[in-house]
Amino acid sequence: MFENLVIIQDQIYNVDKTECLQIGYFLDKKTNKVQIIEFFSTTKKVPKDLPKEITSLSFAFQGNKNEFIEGIQYWDTSNVADMNHMFYWCSDFNQDISMWNTSNVTNMQSMFSWASSFNQDISKWDVSNVLNMKNMFYTAEKFNQDLSTWDVSNVKREYQNIGFVNPNWKPEHWPQFNKAIS
């Protein structure tokens, strides 16, 4: 399994593991993606610069216990194609990441699943290349932003059961899926 992984840069932390001093990442030779190394759940601060080589932020902050992670608001995410499960189980996370460039992202599956406090305006994100939004906001109970203007015409796997798990999110604010399958 690990024979397909090549560490490019190690992750470096302060002593109590609350601040990442250097972002780690590796090449997955099987998928040819340059994947960020998952941060500790205690991480409160990361470098302001995301290495340009990184194309996948998959599971980056899974289970993070903080509402705010200093540094991510400045990240240039223009080279990122995969954000699946990025904030999975980040139940307190609720930070403004509206300035991220998501124009090259194709996978946002479960990006905010179980991020029950997240409720930021991400309506300006360019999601026109996203193919997979399955369970993107699953049990993100507080999320109720207006995403009705998102271009989701390329989405093949859409968010399921929006109204069931997000009762405060009005149907007129949902992305307008047309050819997606659940």
Name what the model sees in each region.
Residues 1-182:
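Negatively charged
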